[in-house]
């Protein structure tokens, strides 16, 4: 499939089956995120894969999950990201967006649908990036 066809195929899916994402497909999606370009190749992205029932229930406290069996939370370490010297712009948000887009297109190439969710409670998501996640 050519790139434009792939880009047109990807859409914001809001209804999912309970079928688990195969590990090989998930690995391909995560690899697409790993090789995504980032400012000065700093790779500030941090990915949290959520697949367990308990994890998805915890995630539901942060945002609506639309019944998806798997979620990838894309975060970025601002201390690791490149900063533009002229105005001090830290591009961690841009890097995270590029990584997310690469993974979503990889998923589409594997016939998996995705949804980019930006409507979430940041304080609730901290549970996934702190020691509290282990409690």
Tell me what each language-model feature is.
Residues 1-25:
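Specificity-determining recognition surfaces
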Residues 15-16, 46, 113-116:
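Short catalytic-loop micro-motif centered on adjacent basic/acidic residues
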Residues 25, 52, 126-127:
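Short Asp/Glu-rich motifs
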Residues 30-31, 35-99:
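Glycine/small-residue-rich phosphate/adenosyl-binding loop
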Residues 33, 72, 87-127:
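Small-aliphatic-rich amphipathic alpha-helix that forms the alpha element of a beta-alpha
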Residues 128-135:
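Conserved small/polar residues in nucleotide/adenosyl-binding loops
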């Amino acid at each position: 499939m050519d790139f434009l066809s792939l880009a047109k195929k990807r859409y914001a899916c809001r209804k999912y089956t309970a079928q688990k994402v195969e590990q090989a497909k998930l690995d391909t999606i995560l690899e697409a995120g790993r090789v995504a370009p980032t400012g000065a190749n700093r790779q500030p992205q941090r990915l949290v894969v959520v697949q367990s029932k308990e994890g998805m229930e915890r995630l539901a406290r942060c945002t609506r999950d639309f019944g998806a069996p798997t979620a990838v939370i894309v975060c970025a370490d601002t201390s690791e990201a490149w900063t533009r010297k002229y105005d001090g712009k830290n591009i961690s948000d841009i890097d995270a967006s590029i990584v997310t887009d690469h993974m979503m297109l990889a998923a589409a190439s594997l016939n998996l649908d995705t949804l980019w969710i930006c409507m979430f409670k940041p304080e609730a998501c901290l549970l996934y990036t702190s020691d509290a996640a282990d409690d």
